[in-house]
């Protein structure tokens, strides 16, 4: 039966009329009389909410997101963090290298990874990785007396790179100073066979500190120390990427990440330590032996030990709430999420409903999550614009139906608000990967992390995001007060998309800047293109049964 279904999809999809729309046949013109034709210019800009507590989940809301189990190992939110943002990937790798190169005796490196490869962190100056390669940098950390712990997903796509990284990292000799060592473990503690261990964090911490002003550093976002990722804002570095072994499946990479110095970094560290120390061991099945994913013997690691506050600091002006996803259907998160956690999902819903003026989404996917669609439709009448940048879905077989779920997310918004809502991608001939997982609302709220815009990231796969609100404010061209860091992040992303300068975009209202996307999409010198999304006749064959496998929504009820 499945063979017949796949053949049927293939036959329809390959036909010249593959863009045939059932809606066109049976009615339902996308520009019907019920559409709101406003382009946002007729809507008065409103002062956005500025208080972090207006955006963040309350302690009770976090508890509710965990099936009624309080979250005791992470703060509700933290203040006084110093955040550095990276809108282009080489910025991230330069910063990671500098931080790792400064580690000293007793320091700890905790890396949570979707994939790890022995790539150079600075391929533009060190293409062979002789000085900045992941293996060399980790060896230097251990030689100086630092320890390294890596939790890496059993990633089949990057298997050969992961195995090589595992073998190299686990073979690093113990430190001659204090016997510190490096250990990489493959982690398969997931709800289903198609799940991903998706958290992407890096923590650099002291073994202990009695300084009441000292705090660790953490990186949170969409990037791994892996192939394909290193790139610049111009996405024209094929020669460097090829010469250094960076290139894998793409010719460039878009992403987002932040560096946190402050108490929020402790939350990121605590998340890692709890996973590492779980009594349920990873990679214990015969599959792991067959695929060479077996792990070495290892020990529990101590929690980080700082005398400074777990909730406040004076290092910067940014307030941060760490949000997560752990499936409520997986029984082996008992130490840290016995009923799962979907605080990330709940935080996104709350933030969208707070929108006063605009929402900017840049994500690997933009597929149907019914609750997120409902929240967007709730605020669309009163905001000026919704701008989305995402990858196209061009094949019914890739991602098991994501082409349909993209249409289902886009169509209701586009039909009702054809001028307020615009969706873009990158030009196909550039062969770029949009891997970003970023939401910016009103230039006040920035969400960045590992979670994609799909159901599995919201409810099933292990994910970790940082929700950021900046107490340092600036006046926008519209005359309202906004957060300095979220606005700066957004402008730098718009530079990447449109090719316009920072100063030009800084002087524009959001509507004016958003209009530059349409200009850039028709300009061959930019990376941007319109994302064309159509209904296809074969969509009815992509059933909810398929969706429950490729994009599960894990929900549980407790009494």
Predicted regions: what is each one?
Residues 13, 61-62, 236, 282, ...:
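A generic structural signal for solvent-exposed, polar alpha-helical segments
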Residues 25-26, 33-108, 115-354, 362, ...:
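HKD-type phospholipase D/PLD-like phosphodiesterase module
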């Amino acid at each position: 039966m499945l063979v017949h279904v796949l053949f049927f999809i293939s036959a329809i999809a390959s036909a010249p009329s593959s863009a045939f729309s059932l809606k066109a046949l049976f009615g339902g013109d996308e520009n019907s009389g019920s559409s709101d034709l406003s382009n946002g210019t007729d809507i008065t800009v409103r002062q956005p909410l500025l208080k972090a507590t207006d955006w963040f989940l309350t302690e009770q809301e976090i508890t509710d997101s965990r099936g009624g189990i309080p979250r005791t190992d992470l703060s509700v939110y933290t203040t006084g963090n110093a955040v550095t943002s990276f809108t282009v990937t080489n910025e991230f790798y330069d910063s990671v290298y500098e931080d790792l190169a400064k580690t000293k005796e007793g320091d700890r490196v905790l890396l949570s990874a979707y994939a790890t490869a022995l790539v150079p962190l600075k391929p533009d100056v060190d293409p062979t990785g002789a000085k900045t390669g992941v293996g060399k940098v980790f060896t230097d950390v251990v030689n100086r007396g630092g320890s390294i712990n890596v939790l890496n997903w059993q990633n089949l796509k990057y298997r050969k790179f992961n195995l090589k990284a595992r073998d190299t990292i686990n073979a690093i000799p113990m430190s001659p100073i204090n016997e510190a060592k490096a250990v990489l473990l493959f982690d398969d503690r997931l709800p289903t066979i198609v799940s991903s261990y998706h958290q992407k964090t890096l923590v650099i911490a002291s073994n202990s500190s009695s300084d009441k002003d000292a705090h660790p550093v953490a990186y949170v976002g969409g990037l791994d120390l892996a192939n394909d990722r290193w790139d610049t804002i111009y996405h024209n570095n094929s020669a460097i990427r090829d010469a250094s072994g960076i290139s894998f499946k793409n010719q460039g990479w878009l992403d987002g990440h932040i560096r946190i110095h402050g108490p929020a970094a402790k939350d990121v560290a605590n998340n890692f330590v709890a996973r590492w120390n779980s009594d349920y061991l990873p990679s214990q099945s015969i599959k792991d032996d067959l695929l060479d994913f077996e792990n070495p013997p290892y020990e529990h690691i101590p929690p980080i030990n700082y005398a400074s506050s777990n909730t406040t600091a004076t290092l910067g002006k940014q307030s941060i709430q760490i949000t997560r996803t752990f499936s409520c259907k997986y029984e082996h998160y008992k130490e840290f999420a016995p009923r799962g956690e979907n605080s990330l999902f709940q935080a996104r819903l709350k933030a969208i409903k707070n929108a006063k003026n605009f929402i900017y989404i840049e994500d690997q996917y933009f597929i149907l999550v019914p609750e997120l669609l409902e929240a967007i439709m709730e605020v669309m009448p009163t905001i000026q614009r919704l701008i989305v940048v995402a990858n196209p879905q061009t094949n019914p077989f890739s991602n098991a139906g994501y082409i349909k779920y993209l249409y289902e997310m886009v169509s209701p918004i586009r039909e009702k608000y054809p001028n307020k809502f615009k969706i873009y991608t990158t030009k196909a001939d550039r062969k770029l990967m949009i891997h970003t997982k970023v939401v910016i609302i009103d230039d006040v709220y920035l969400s960045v992390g590992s979670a994609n815009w799909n159901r599995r990231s919201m409810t099933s796969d292990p994910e970790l995001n940082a929700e950021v609100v900046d107490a340092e404010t600036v006046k926008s061209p519209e005359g309202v007060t906004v957060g300095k860091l979220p606005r700066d992040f957004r402008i730098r992303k718009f530079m990447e998309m449109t090719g316009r300068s920072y100063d030009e975009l800084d002087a524009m209202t959001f509507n004016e800047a958003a209009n530059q996307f349409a200009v850039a999409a028709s300009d061959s010198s930019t990376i941007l293109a319109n994302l064309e999304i159509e209904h296809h006749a074969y969509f009815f064959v992509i059933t909810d049964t398929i969706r429950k496998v490729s994009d599960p929504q894990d929900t549980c009820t407790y009494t």
